[in-house]
Structure formats: C-alpha cells, structure tokens
Amino acid sequence: MLTRIQHFAIVSENFVREAKFYESVFDMKRSKPGSEEEQKAIRTNYAVSISDGYVGVTVIGRKPGYVPGLHHFGVDVDDVNEAIRRVRKNYPEVAVLKRPSNRPFATYGAHDPEGNYFDLTEEGASNRRDVYVEAQREQPRRVHHLKLRVMNPAAIAAFYRDSFDLREADKALEDPNYYLTDGRMTLIIAPWKMSDFEGAGIDRPGLEHVGFKVEDVGAVKKELAALREINPELRERIISEVSEGERRLALIASCRHGQFQFSSPDGIFVDVCEH
C-alpha cells in the first residue's frame, strides 16, 4: 500500500494569526487567499488550510470543548477500503467513521489502540478540496516530522506500520523511539513517561511537536528575531517560569532531528533541522 503522511491539524485560539506565522516563517501557502470562501471561514471561526506543497495543515478555530494545540494528523492511501479492512480485521476495537463532507482532507476518521485520532483519505475522494487537491511542489522549507508520545510505543508503531505499510527507519539500539516514514515525511512514535515532566507542568500523551526541514537554521533564527520586531503579534509563546520552560524545551530538544526549538504564537512546539 502506498501511504503518504500529508496532513495535520491545529486547534487555535486565533487561527488566522497561527496560519500567518507558518506562512511567514516557513513559506507555507493558502490555496485561495482572500477568496470569498476563505473570508466566510474566517468570519465563522471555521478554519484555514496552508501547505508546503506536500503536507497540508488545517488550522481550526477553537470551538467550545476543543483543546487547543496539535490536534491530529492524517494519511493519504492509494486504497482506503483496503486500509479500513486491515484496521478492522487486526484491531476490532478501533473505530473507523465516515466524516462529514465539508472536511477538506478527512474522508474517514479513525484512532489507534491508545485513542490517538487520525484522518484517512485517498486521492480523488469527493470531499477533498483546497490545498489538498493542488499539485505537489518543492520548496526549501517543509514539514519533516511529527512526534507522537504514547504509553506503548512498540505496539502503536506496529499499528501504523502494519496497517499502512509505512517504512520503519533505522535507529540506534538505545533509541526508544520508532521512526515511521513515507520516504519524505516521518511520524516519530516516542514513549510518554510522567517522570519526563519532573520539575515542570505535565502534558498528556499525544502529538508533542512538529519539525521542519530548512535550508539554513541560522537564517530561520534571524528571521524569527526580525519578525518579533516587525510584527509582535507573531512572536512565540513563552513559559513564564524559567526552569519549567527549560525542562519542556529539553524534552523537545531530545528529538534526534531537531537543531533549534521554539514555539508558535499559540504555543505549538516547533523544531527545525537542516538534514
């Protein structure tokens, strides 16, 4: 089965600002900026979608009951019926649901055995629109990985690997993480331990951060500094308690791919790498 990790979603208190941040720093693009459809989405606190040419990001306006932050990711498969068949056969406790037709990416929604939600679709699905139907393009700055912290990383990695034929990348023997790749984008499955949060605020299992590959980490640092001066609204979120902030950043920095860590205006942790 050919599988592409081509989507993730953010729930945001200010989704227009959050999308603008990724446009400004990583040159991500909207499909129809300024269109009536987009303006209606903004007026109704719905969502906007941006893309690096391969991975689409839907930034959703926060509604009552929604938890802000990285919300879910999505995969595109070449045979969605076969993917659903595998999941239902091997993991009967996992639910797969048809999604409403107004979702720009998700044709189906499902979850892994620990309850982490993900979207499932295939090329040509009738619901797909916006950045998710545009031709692929290359650009110097692109989404490189997502990190998912779980209680049982071996079992969850097996679920995604065997259900969707993602390739497991090589790693050091002492590395507790699993690296599942479609050849371009990587899903990192990492252990969640409460002890990792000693001395800092505790966060639940789930998506931890997003990583971008860039042409020059130093250039990104300079552009972030300039952005703070030019448009303070787009400055990153900080943790007021210094020691707790250092502890949380250290967790993000443990990613083998990351060279520099920061956060978006909404507090989404981001790391960047050149290789």
Predicted segment positions?
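N-terminal beta-strand motif that seeds the catalytic metal site of vicinal oxygen chelate
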Residues: M1-A19, L70-F73, E123-A157, L207-V210, ...
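Core segments of cupin and vicinal oxygen chelate
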Residues: M1-L2, A9-G56, K147-M194
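Helix N-cap motif at beta-to-alpha junctions
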Residues: N14-F15, D78-N81, N152-P153, V214-G218
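Short acidic/glycine-enriched loop/turn segments that link adjacent beta-strands
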Residues: E37-T44, V67, N102-A106, L173-P176, ...
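Polar/charged low-complexity regions in secreted precursors and cytosolic/nuclear IDRs
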Residues: D52-G53, G69-G74, D79, E114, ...
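Short amphipathic alpha-helices within nucleic acid-binding modules
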Residues: V80-V87, G218-L224
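Vicinal oxygen chelate
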Residues: R85-Q139, Y179, A225-H275
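Structured core of small recognition/catalytic domains
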Residues: A154-A157, R161-L234, A250-L251, P265
